[in-house]
Amino acid sequence: MMSNRSDFIVPDEAAVKRAASVNFHLEPLRPWLDDPQITEVCVNRPGEVFCERASAWEYYAVPNLDYEHLISLGTATARFVDQDISDSRPVLSAILPMGERIQIVRPPACEHGTISVTIRKPSFTRRTLEDYAQQGFFKHVRPMSKSLTPFEQELLALKEAGDYMSFLRRAVQLERVIVVAGETGSGKTTLMKALMQEIPFDQRLITIEDVPELFLPDHPNHVHLFYPSEAKEEENAPVTAATLLRSCLRMKPTRILLAELRGGETYDFINVAASGHGGSITSCHAGSCELTFERLALMVLQNRQGRQLPYEIIRRLLYLVVDVVVHVHNGVHDGTGRHISEVWYDPNTKRALSLQHSEKAQ
């Protein structure tokens, strides 16, 4: 019996051509896309590729991967998924023909003359619980405890001893979330850049700012993202600090460095920090360490989703997520100049809040 022609799915010729165009533009990356040991393929700028293998980054020079080719890859990918990527919509999230997830950022949302491409390869690895047990997966589970960890005790001892340089250095190395607060002209950005120098050079860093200030000459695996200073999430601007924060989650950052918290993007920053991306550093305007938490809470309330949360919940989240607040001041009138006036670090309060929530949940 002959089957009815309607039983067959006729391939869409146009879709096949669009997929072929994407695959053609991916050819310079094919050696790493086809390598089963590589999980992530990143292009930060023309001519260079960073790949993640066994949780370590590898660098490769690819001279034929020029700017025009990367622009064409973005255009082909956008057509394949029936989306747009352009100067007015410079961020694209998509799934490639072979199932890889891709994130593309082009100018003006990144540095002029560069394009950021992040490709995450799907994992086909299957493990049983027995496999996990043999690999020691369950050997390091720590029960909830009121006791501080050795690292927390170390940081607290440095702070109480007044060794603030060593305290800040270790806080960065231990991937604590740090907020630098102070008034305009107090030196927040300059201190942020000093803290960034303590980040290990092999980590992948992504900065978000409206004006290029957070330079990373010693960290080769980095991407600088930019948003217009007048862009507002509430007005549905295509590129804002908040949209770039969300984009970061698809770009495999080790750390996210946001130049300044000014409004509703604070909600997204807290979300990102709470999702396990430790080591983030940012700044805000505030008159003291305690007022920093008030300012952050008020800025969370400027977000559509954030304002749905009770103020007490927002404050609690901030104390759980933010590890260190450094307040800087410019003593113009008393002649003290720019200096750190306060440092907040209170792991005991953080632990108590966490345990309190855990006990209520039980």
Curated annotation (Swiss-Prot):
MF annotations from Gene Ontology: ATP binding; ATP hydrolysis activity
Record localization: Cytoplasm
Membrane keyword on record: no
GO cellular component: cytoplasm; type IV secretion system complex
InterPro entries: P-loop_NTPase, Sigma_54_int_dom_ATP-bd_1, T2SS/T4SS_dom, T4SS_GSP_E_ATPase, VirB11
Binding site for ATP: 182-189
Signal peptide: none
Keyword entries, A-Z: ATP-binding, Cytoplasm, Nucleotide-binding, Virulence
Pfam families (alphabetical): T2SSE
Keyword Nucleotide-binding: yes
Main localisation: cytoplasm
SUPFAM superfamilies xrefs: P-loop containing nucleoside triphosphate hydrolases
GO terms of biological process kind: secretion by the type IV secretion system
Gene3D superfamilies: 3.30.450.90, P-loop containing nucleotide triphosphate hydrolases (3.40.50.300)
Family: Belongs to the GSP E family.
PANTHER family hit by this protein: TWITCHING MOTILITY PROTEIN PILT (PTHR30486), TYPE IV PILUS RETRACTATION ATPASE PILT (PTHR30486:SF6)
Protein name per its UniProtKB record: Type IV secretion system protein VirB11
Organism: Brucella melitensis biotype 1 (strain ATCC 23456 / CCUG 17765 / NCTC 10094 / 16M)
